[in-house]
Regions:
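Phosphate/nucleotide-binding catalytic core
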Residues: 1-147
Length: 147
């Protein structure tokens, strides 16, 4: 487990992509760059020169807080954080990034999700089949654990 490579995508709302990018840049002590494109993306480099992206996701029901009330927000409040290729030692960094984003108004709702991509180079077909079967049989338990 500790020698696997992975990537993570975390969907959120409550703050704009620009504010999320500035939060991430502040965390890393770098700067945010608006790269635009079809996902209206922002890019932030970390100390290892890896690029973290903040992109839009059309499936997110955008919201923000106004005077303590959660209200509908425009599409700039659709935020998906896309990590670079990560390793086990990055788990603490990811936790701290999420905390920083939450301190700056990030929130989630039922339209938000987390996607974890695990490098397959260490798994043969039987391993992949076993993992798929475990995930399928424990899907409800995993879902409850993430709520």
């Amino acid at each position: 487990m500790k020698d696997l490579r992975y990537g993570i995508e975390i969907e959120m709302t409550g703050l704009s992509r620009g504010k999320a990018a500035e939060t991430l840049a502040g965390f890393f002590g770098t700067r945010a760059e608006h790269t635009g494109g079809s996902y209206d993306a922002y890019a932030v480099r970390d100390a290892q020169d890896r690029v973290w992206k903040l992109v839009s996701d059309g499936s997110i029901q955008t919201q923000k807080k106004v005077r303590g009330q959660t209200v509908h927000a425009d599409s700039t409040y659709s935020v998906e954080l896309v990590s670079p290729v990560c390793v086990y030692e990055d788990i603490g960094t990811i936790q701290e990034i999420v905390r920083a984003l939450r301190r700056n108004s990030a929130l989630v709702n039922d339209s938000c999700g987390i996607h974890v991509h695990v490098g397959a180079e260490k798994f043969d077909a039987q391993h992949q089949r076993n993992i798929t079967n475990i995930m399928a049989s424990k899907e409800e338990l995993i879902y409850k654990a993430l709520q």
